[in-house]
Amino acid sequence: MSEECTHDCSNCGAACSSRDAAPQHDAPNPNSSVKKVIGVVSGKGGVGKSMTSALLACAMARRGYHCGILDADITGPSIPKLFGIHGRAMADEKGCWPIQSRMGIDVMSINLLVENEEDPVVWRGPVIAGAVKQFWTDVVWKDVDFLFVDMPPGTGDVPLTVFQSLPVDGIVVVASPQELVSMIVAKAVNMAEMMKVPMLGIVENMSYVVCPDCGKHINVFGDSHVDEVAAKHHLSVLAKCPIDPQLASLSDAGLIETYPGQYLEGAADACEKLLKK
């Protein structure tokens, strides 16, 4: 394989060993049972990707599905904090066991394995990617309908590892309203196409804020460009989520499961359709 390989055989004439090879995903823990794997990605940080992962898992749990969240953001884990989970994950001869949230959502994160959750994880890329892979191969995801993989921003080692190692059934892209989103979303879409992973659609976060006095929607970051970006890439806009102080407060308190907003129902519908295919 060439060092310049993009993993997209359709535009390559080289007769390398990867051509026409079926994807070789890593086998999960033998005690695991996962029906669908959903990757939640973003082209840059700070757009609310982890919050979207958490709320989407909550939305599916309310529909009666058993959900799990694999926190693949090793150097910036936030999923346990959102759910108010501060314990240590336990392991036995079957593997490492995720910790369940109040709603029964299985959570695995590097913060559940370190001595102090405030200790930084200072690892190089290959070690980080290896840890994410072990969250799939060593953790027992028992009878999970939807496993949401909260990935770090960008298109680096971890997303590549996830797409190559896990049987990802669909990707949700989280973006913000700024015009810059066009280029950022394009990068995520192009990577998904290279790895032959289907896109479920785009979630626009921080889309607007609701005036507490008159109820008017105020576009804090200017006019949204998500519809034109979605149309350009033939994608659906799954949700437009507002800036909500209540959500911020509940997240800080580890009570995200009690948030009453239902802005991600469209994204939940897209995930649910995967089970019916």
Feature map (PLM): residue ranges:
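Residue-level signature of catalytic and energy-coupling elements of molecular machines
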Residues: 34, 45, 71, 79, ...
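C-terminal lobe/tail of nucleotide-utilizing enzymes
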Residues: 1-25, 189-277
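Conserved Switch II/interswitch segment of TRAFAC-class P-loop GTPases
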Residues: 142-149, 155-156, 167-188
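Phosphate-binding/switch loop-helix module in NTP-utilizing enzymes
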Residues: 114-162
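Glycine-rich phosphate-binding loops of nucleotide-dependent enzymes
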Residues: 108, 151, 164, 200, ...
